[in-house]
Amino acid sequence: MEEKRYTSDIAGHCNEPTAWQILKEVSEQLAEHKQLVVNPFIIEICEDGHFSLLPSETQVVGFDAPEADNTHRNEASVVWSLGATLFHIVMARQVMNGKGGAGQKEASKLPYMRSEWPKMSELVQQCLRYQPTQRPTLKQLHDSATEQYSRCTEEVRRGPKFKKKLNSLTDGTINATNNMGFWPETMHETHPFNPITEA
């Protein structure tokens, strides 16, 4: 019997289609089971290629929303945790210098994920907003992730498009596996929530 694997095991090695798939499947499971805790250590990678959220009532340090604790959580706080979870899976780093919501203030700038994944980076920033009412809902996350996952898988089916010559070391498509530890947690201002739709 193979040892169980979790999304924490692929942190920094996750491609864009897989990241959208994780968001799509986990947001749906959170809504279905009314679970208010999520982090990379309780999302199991199944043998059939899907992802399963394991039951948990205790959060890991660095993945709780600024307004949440072990007794006061709601959908908005779990959306924040899901954004922090996705950031960790893609970047192999924790938000707010590992402190999570405990280290976030209303004036804090939000971490920007990857220059070549602008839609996902924007959506994660929306999840990590300090004010709970400014975050997307689980349904909005699921709908956006479903659309973007379909786009990614269609692009894989059609094959790569021609890309312009890079203007700098941080332009274009750069594989996370080859750049672990290279990407800084840069900061970027955000704007009022507007659910992502494909242009």
Language-model regions: role of each:
Residues 91-95:
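Structural helix C-cap motif within protein kinase domains
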Residues 130-155:
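Terminal C-lobe "cap" of eukaryotic-type protein kinase domains
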Residues 8-21:
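Activation segment of protein kinase catalytic domains, centered on the conserved DFG
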Residues 26-37:
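Protein kinase catalytic-loop region centered on the HRD/HxD motif
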Residues 67-76:
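Conserved end of the kinase activation segment
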